[in-house]
A protein has these predicted regions:
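Short gly/ser/thr-rich secondary-structure transition/capping motifs
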Residues: 21-23, 81-82
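Bacterial N-terminal signal peptides
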Residues: 6-15
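Short, solvent-exposed mixed-charge patches
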Residues: 108-109
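Sec/Tat signal peptide C-region and signal peptidase I cleavage site
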Residues: 15-21
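Stable alpha-helical elements in mature extracytoplasmic
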Residues: 24, 28, 65, 69, ...
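Sequence/structural segment immediately N-terminal to covalent heme-attachment motifs in c-type
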Residues: 24-43
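Positively charged n-region of N-terminal signal peptides that target proteins for export
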Residues: 1-4
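Axial heme c-ligation environment in periplasmic c-type cytochrome domains
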Residues: 39, 45-59, 71-101
Length: 109
């Protein structure tokens, strides 16, 4: 029984890590350029908007973070990181938004 539970736990870890790693750095950077994110955001420094590392740190442990951030990417908004509003990205596919948000949330400072 212990071996079954250990195997199940290992499988869940692999599945979870594979999902989080579904977007690598090169793919994320290409997506950021294609969708215009790189004009305001960088991985490790503030440009106009916060760095993705800052976003990941702010939302660490928040189970609602993926949904909150996906909504913010799609609809835009202001007041969370300063006065300059983030424009909406309504034409970016839901799959691309999810992949990018999931990747951002894996980053560490």
């Amino acid at each position: 029984m212990k071996f079954v539970l250990a195997g199940l736990a290992a499988a869940l870890l692999v599945i979870g890590n594979a999902e989080a790693a579904s977007l690598d750095m090169a793919a994320a950077e290409a997506m950021m350029k294609k969708d215009g994110c790189a004009a305001c955001h960088a991985v490790d420094k503030k440009i106009i908007g916060p760095s993705y590392q800052e976003v990941a740190a702010k939302y660490k442990g928040d189970k609602e973070a993926p949904a909150k951030l996906a909504k913010k990417v799609k609809e835009g908004g202001s007041g969370v990181w300063g006065q300059i509003p983030m424009p909406p990205n309504a034409t970016t596919s839901d799959a691309d938004v999810k992949a990018l948000v999931d990747w951002i949330l894996t980053l560490k400072k």
